[in-house]
Amino acid sequence: MLSLESIKKAPRADGFASILAIGRANPDNIIEQSAYPDFYFRVTNSEHLVDLKKKFQRICEKTAIRKRHFVWNEEFLTANPCFSTFMDKSLNVRQEVAISEIPKLGAKAATKAIEDWGQPKSRITHLIFCTTSGMDLPGADYQLTQILGLNPNVERVMLYQQGCFAGGTTLRLAKCLAESRKGARVLVVCAETTTVLFRAPSEEHQDDLVTQALFADGASAVIVGADPDEAADERASFVIVSTSQVLLPDSAGAIGGHVSEGGLLATLHRDVPQIVSKNVGKCLEEAFTPFGISDWNSIFWVPHPGGRAILDQVEERVGLKPEKLSVSRHVLAEYGNMSSVCVHFALDEMRKRSANEGKATTGEGLEWGVLFGFGPGLTVETVVLRSVPL
């Protein structure tokens, strides 16, 4: 019989948790940002709002987004006219789509991550699923185990309604799980859809135009584990050295999301870029002082691309060279703001770009890097990463 002491002393991992694989997925429906204002006002029967459309066109032009992917399409919107009225009772329809599509979109990303990992899925010991899109019992984590055929004893964590900072949250939790048990392999999946927040424009609620111009659909999957099994050709892409979360001072209400019968209504205060950029220096100092690093151009950057203004003001405030945020800007341009998904896309883009350009490491040839998640609260997740040689 095992003693309590022997159970307590179950072997932990020897090393740091590492990102062992990354997968990503997007829906097939693509809309160019330049064409989106015409599409948006046409499908919502709002073309009579001429001045509002001109304002929306200006907003879209400033986003630095080239295209976005969506689960929904024009046929769906036509069949559900409740989406063509601002805050019409539509929660049931939104829920049905999210509950159906989020697990499937997440499974596509997870399948790619497992292929990238190159190990049998039976080695997955934990699952973290994160979405701000719809809620159900059992949740999207359960649905994913059924789609992928994961072991029934996989230990699951379901995160709902976290928002844009959660790409960092999932890595923080995965690090704790991976390092707490020798041999643990954590599958992290984030999946988001704008089905929960798409709605017609309103002259009385013009703040929502920014939401309609920014957000998009996608899914990411990351496999995290410590002590890569070199004999099985398991290889790390990034080492997760440390993680932290903080609520920024004087930021209550700056970013939020409120669910009602009309769906999820996001609030994005115009001061968000200023609040984030004002505080990012302190986050950097607290994270990197233990490692003797204070030159922010000497590390690689993976901030959440919540919007062009956030990236611009962080770059200016910290004194970054323009190329330091190129990966996050690329993700924003090609996919829009996919909430929790974005930073995982950026990590994948960085390692692939580094390899293609012949860099010495997965982090643009640099050793140390930072990943930031920004979201409701205003909450900041800070993840210190270490690249690996290529």
Curated annotation (Swiss-Prot):
Its EC number is 2.3.1.-. One of its GO terms (molecular function) is acyltransferase activity, transferring groups other than amino-acyl groups. It catalyses: 3-(3-hydroxyphenyl)-propanoyl-CoA + 3 malonyl-CoA + 3 H(+) = 3,3',5-trihydroxybibenzyl + 4 CO2 + 4 CoA. The active site is at C164. It holds the Pfam family Chal_sti_synt_C. One of its GO terms (biological process) is flavonoid biosynthetic process. Keywords: Acyltransferase, Flavonoid biosynthesis, Transferase. Belongs to the thiolase-like superfamily. Chalcone/stilbene synthases family. This is Bibenzyl synthase. The gene is BIBSY212.
